[in-house]
């Protein structure tokens, strides 16, 4: 059973959704930041459909949790539950361009072939040392702590490399008991370590000049434009909810800068 939701900060409770503990961990860490609901149109707060065959349909729920704070333009969680077909949490923090911060990205995906899991503090301008050095100096030790405890997920496309840091933690895990154990014992604490570092960086961040803010904004737009164009969830969401809804969701909610 799912709950009816009226604003973007209303709780997401989807029966059987495997990533619920991760979302709850993240929301708890945002307490104390004076979060406000982020404007999300009603039709994207929660949608329910069916997938699969006529003889064996699978219920699908896609929900959006989102907020904004003093330093974060948008914090949002795209939550998808489709039984054995898919289970997804895409959790992203988009900072305001008035602060020299990266993006936080957590992508937790379960498909019939296995789990695809990625964590990063993604740079808006990877070649800008002022933007990256203070982040990477603290991120790399956390990355190294967890990297050797997880299988490597494989190389990322060259065109995507400007949007990932050297601390990009990326793995593929099998379905079943082995993968579930690694998710609980390694991936969940790694997710929280990455998020804790991000929130520490944000807490100490000070406003930048208008000129610097404009430079950061251009970098952020390149990132969001790329993500909107290449969103790997597009095919899945289109299959579940149709093309019109999916394109509107990608461009007006997920990557709306």
Swiss-Prot record:
Keyword Oxidoreductase: yes
Function noted in UniProt: Catalyzes the two-electron reduction of the C2 and C3(1) diene system of 15,16-dihydrobiliverdin.
Entry's EC annotation: 1.3.7.3
Record protein name field: Phycoerythrobilin:ferredoxin oxidoreductase
Phylogenetic lineage: Bacteria, Bacillati, Cyanobacteriota, Cyanophyceae, Synechococcales
Family listed: Belongs to the HY2 family.
Alphabetized UniProt keyword annotations: Oxidoreductase
Reactions mediated catalytically: (3Z)-phycoerythrobilin + oxidized 2[4Fe-4S]-[ferredoxin] = 15,16-dihydrobiliverdin + reduced 2[4Fe-4S]-[ferredoxin] + 2 H(+)
A single BP term in Gene Ontology: phytochromobilin biosynthetic process
Oxidoreductase listed as a keyword: yes
């Amino acid at each position: 059973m799912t709950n009816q939701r009226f604003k973007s900060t209303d709780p997401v409770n989807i029966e059987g959704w495997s990533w619920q503990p991760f979302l709850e961990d993240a929301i708890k860490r945002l307490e104390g930041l004076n979060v406000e609901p982020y404007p999300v149109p009603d039709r994207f707060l929660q949608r329910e459909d069916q997938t699969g065959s006529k003889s064996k349909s699978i219920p699908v729920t896609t929900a959006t949790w989102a907020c904004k704070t003093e330093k974060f333009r948008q914090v949002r969680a795209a939550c998808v539950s489709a039984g054995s077909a898919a289970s997804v949490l895409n959790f992203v923090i988009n900072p305001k361009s008035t602060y020299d911060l990266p993006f936080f990205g957590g992508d937790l995906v379960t498909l019939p072939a296995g789990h695809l899991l990625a964590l990063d503090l993604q740079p808006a301008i990877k070649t800008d040392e002022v933007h990256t050095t203070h982040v990477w100096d603290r991120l790399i030790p956390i990355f190294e702590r967890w990297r050797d405890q997880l299988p490597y997920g494989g190389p990322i496309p060259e065109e995507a490399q400007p949007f990932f840091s050297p601390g990009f933690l990326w793995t593929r895990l099998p379905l079943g008991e082995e993968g579930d154990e690694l998710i609980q014992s390694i991936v969940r604490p790694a997710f929280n370590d990455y998020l804790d570092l991000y929130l520490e960086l944000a807490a100490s961040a000070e406003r930048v000049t208008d000129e610097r803010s404009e430079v950061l904004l251009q970098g952020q737009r390149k990132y969001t434009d790329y993500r909107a164009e290449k969103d790997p969830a597009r095919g899945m969401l289109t299959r579940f909810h149709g093309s019109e809804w999916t394109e509107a969701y990608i461009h007006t909610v997920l990557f709306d800068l």
